[in-house]
Amino acid sequence: MSTPANFNGARPVIDVNDAVMLLIDHQSGLFQTVGDMPMPELRARAAALAKIATLANIPVITTASVPQGPNGPLIPEIHANAPHAQYVARKGEINAWDNPEFVAAVKATGRNTLIVAGTITSVCMAFPSISAVADGYKVFAVIDASGTYSKMAQEITLARVVQAGVVPMDTAAVASEIQRTWNREDAAQWAEVYTHIFPAYQLLIESYGKAQEVVKNSEVLDSQR
């Protein structure tokens, strides 16, 4: 059985004060190759991760693979939701960790816990995650904010990164682990994040809001009109 790497016996949970988010190759061209989940869901979750990082003051580093070519540009929501994000241009390296400037940007944060998502999962997410583990980092891979061309490719990649010591997570778990409590001033902003991770959550918010409105305004039920 594989165990999470570089935690030295500690619980494999995200330390917000030690975390940096790496959003790799979430590009409009590559998104067109995704087959393991609906593309709009992938796009929304990648954008949600950027917003999570902003709410939690987590550094964000982005990069793209030849964005001037068929892979296309980064989706704009990422930098819109994380205006503090640092973009690192690569010189053609497929594995972002093979780019010295990218690794230097990670090291410059002084943080050792990486939250990684990338498209395609089996390459853009997996390669740097495995490399970072080998360099001593704690790595959390956000699988449902990383897309690839088939469900089989996703499952194979998940097995591979777990064997390497990477901790797999989903976007909702990342949000909840970082948020920690609803007893905070920005709770409404966190609630909005969940509506992008799973849109049905918006229905819960609307139902709750209406129930409060009925009580507050002593609204007469339709059956009593």
What kind of feature is each model-predicted range?
Residues G92-A104:
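Short phosphate-binding loop-to-helix
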Residues S2-G92, A108, K138, E155-V162, ...:
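Active-site acidic carboxylates
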Residues N71, D98, M125:
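Conserved donor sugar-nucleotide recognition element shared by glycan-biosynthetic enzymes
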Residues V106-N112:
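Glycine-rich phosphate-binding loop signature in dinucleotide/nucleotide-binding domains
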Residues L74, E101, F127-S131:
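A short acidic, amphipathic alpha-helical/loop segment
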Residues A80, A104, I130, A134:
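Short, well-ordered alpha-helices that flank and scaffold nucleotide-derived cofactor binding pockets
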Residues T113-T171:
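A contiguous pocket-lining binding segment that forms or flanks enzyme active sites
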